[in-house]
Curated annotation (Swiss-Prot):
Pfam families associated with the record: ATP-sulfurylase, PUA_2
Protein's name in the database: Sulfate adenylyltransferase
PANTHER family documented for this protein: PTHR43509, SULFATE ADENYLYLTRANSFERASE
Name of encoding gene: sat
GO BP field: hydrogen sulfide biosynthetic process; sulfate assimilation
Molecular function terms, GO-annotated: ATP binding; sulfate adenylyltransferase (ATP) activity
HAMAP family: Sulf_adenylyltr (MF_00066)
Enzyme type, top EC level: transferase
Record's catalysed reaction(s): sulfate + ATP + H(+) = adenosine 5'-phosphosulfate + diphosphate
Family in the record: Belongs to the sulfate adenylyltransferase family.
Keyword Nucleotidyltransferase: yes
Length: 392
């Protein structure tokens, strides 16, 4: 008989060995809902709500709450938690000094969203100030306020609250409900499908021919693909999640074997932290049950802040500790002479034969209602994107 533990560990053990679950249900939830009415209250922005959800469902295992100063300092300075596990991005709960002054260590705090919904609770164990410039420099590699992630750091409250959380209500992802699975559920799915090896693919962009080529190359060596697009907060000029989700369905339906790929949302905010975020993305996909993770060119990058393969170089230093196999791919393109997709590793021809289209150029063309070259994008995908952006 297959036990719950065998299913959870079917492909790979979670980061730290245990899949965290801070979701309260049934009578416990009813009691907590009632008790929370008398708790002190703080309101979380969408970024913090998505972090709360990912802690609660185990996506951020082994974290059981927002980081205290020891973990925070170790992560910022050394890319590890205090217990020695690799962790690359601080998961923190910022508040203003005025809010912090009203709270005392030991307080139970009700965590509300900007929509007025009660999402969870925090047992306050610590409150501490932090150096914004140091966090920006170490995590994002720059103190430039034009960087969207750095700007978020500078705009945050000056105090971090720390302590274990409980997740009472989940953020609603209604339009993506068919694709909303928690790490325990994806692990069950992989067990049911018989996938012993699974490659995770992170994206905040539509999947074009270059991505498809990389995913299919990976599928040659593993049992299944988890297409795991980020649907939390992104930059205003990124293509909206609902449009992207429709495009992912189009490409999977028309160009992938039905028993080899699954689409599941990743309900996180995008930090644009490049190399450091690549490590977080790999860690989270390990928690979702992936044994392999794809890191391509300029992973989680923005503008010209990071080198083309800087994320691959950094994550390579931690690959043994992460215990998930990193598949590093070069920039893929369509080669006119080869007559197919290729990379510099497989194509001998001059760059003049290569068809590249940057994400910026794609967005520009789509917003102008222009069609995308079939060498760059599948027609079914282009059609969804043009229609979706007109509606948005």
């Amino acid at each position: 008989m297959t036990t719950h533990e065998q299913i959870i560990n079917y492909t790979i053990k979670p980061h730290g060995g245990t899949l965290i679950n801070r979701v309260v249900e049934g009578e416990e939830r009813d009691h907590l809902l009632e008790a929370a009415q008398s708790y002190k209250v703080i309101t979380l922005n969408p970024w913090s709500i998505s972090d709360l959800e990912l802690i609660g469902i185990g996506g951020f295992s082994p974290l059981t709450g927002f980081m205290g100063v020891a973990d925070y300092t170790k992560v910022v300075e050394d890319t590890h938690l205090e217990n020695g596990l690799v962790w690359s991005i601080p998961i923190t709960l910022p508040v203003t000094e005025e809010e912090a002054d009203k709270l005392e260590i030991g307080d139970d705090i009700a965590l509300y969203g900007e929509d007025g919904e009660l999402y969870g609770t925090l047992k306050l164990e610590e409150k501490y100030t932090y150096d914004k410039k140091k966090e920006a420099q170490n995590v994002y590699g720059t103190t430039d306020e034009a960087h969207p992630g750095v700007k978020k750091v500078y705009d945050k409250g000056n105090v971090y609250l720390a302590g274990p959380i409980q997740l009472i209500n989940r953020p609603k992802h209604d339009e993506f409900s068919d694709f909303h699975l928690d790490p325990a559920e994806t692990r069950q799915l992989f067990h049911d499908l018989g996938w012993k090896t699974v490659v995770g693919f992170q994206t905040r962009n539509p999947v074009h021919r270059a991505h498809e080529y990389i995913q299919k190359s990976a599928l040659e060596i593993v049992d299944g693909l988890l297409l795991n697009p980020l649907v939390g907060e992104t930059k205003s000029d990124d293509i909206p999640a609902n449009v992207r989700m429709e495009s992912y369905q189009a490409i999977l339906k028309n160009y992938f074997p039905k028993d080899r790929a699954r689409l599941v949302i990743y309900p996180a905010a995008m930090r644009y932290a490049g190399p450091r975020e690549a490590i977080l993305h790999a860690t989270v996909r390990k928690n979702y049950g992936c044994t392999h993770f794809i890191v391509g060119r300029d992973h989680a990058g923005v503008g010209d802040y990071y080198g083309t393969y800087e994320a691959q170089e950094l994550i390579s230093q931690f690959e043994d500790e992460l215990d998930i196999q990193i598949l590093k791919f070069e920039h893929a393109f369509y080669c006119e002479k080869c007559g197919n997709m290729a990379t510099a590793k497989t194509c001998p021809h001059d760059a003049s034969e290569h068809v590249h289209l940057s994400g910026t150029k794609v967005r520009e063309k789509l917003r102008n209602g222009e069609s995308l070259p079939t060498k760059f994008s599948r027609p079914e995908v282009a059609e969804v994107l043009i229609k979706g952006l007109k509606q948005n």
